């Protein structure tokens, strides 16, 4: 079955990629979850739109990715969140909040979907955060969550 990915699926591809998958995987998982659409001639226009949007926010080349990695590695990112007396947060820290904290700390603008968090951040402390800037470049920085 030929499908067009609308979201990044690990081990399969990026948005806009046309891939061949087994019928059951496509019909029972990818299509109902919204990860893909069925391939048709009319869907070619949608593929073009997805690829255009991806290229607009993608880091262009390896050199630029390494430059952004250098900016992130030396960055001290602190995020203030509401917490109770025991240090447990009211809710959890989202990827969008982390991206905003990086921007506020003087870092580059990042895509929240490329963040790789070790687990849900639900308490005050220091956490390692990784971000995949390019297929060959991954940057890491420490996020400090403080009561605020």
Swiss-Prot record:
Keywords, comma-separated and alphabetical: Ribonucleoprotein, Ribosomal protein, RNA-binding, rRNA-binding
Family recorded in the similarity comment: Belongs to the bacterial ribosomal protein bL9 family.
One Pfam match: Ribosomal_L9_C
Record flagged with keyword Transmembrane: no
PANTHER family documented for this protein: 50S RIBOSOMAL PROTEIN L9
Role according to the record: Binds to the 23S rRNA.
Name by which UniProt lists this protein: Large ribosomal subunit protein bL9
SUPFAM superfamilies in alphabetical order: L9 N-domain-like, Ribosomal protein L9 C-domain
GO cellular component: ribonucleoprotein complex; ribosome
UniProt keyword Ribonucleoprotein, yes or no: yes
InterPro entries: Ribosomal_bL9, Ribosomal_bL9/RNase_H1_N, Ribosomal_bL9_bac/chp, Ribosomal_bL9_C, Ribosomal_bL9_C_sf, Ribosomal_bL9_N, Ribosomal_bL9_N_sf
UniProt-listed GO biological process terms: translation
Domain of life of the source: Bacteria
Organism for this UniProt entry: Salinispora arenicola (strain CNS-205)
One GO MF term attached to the UniProt entry: rRNA binding
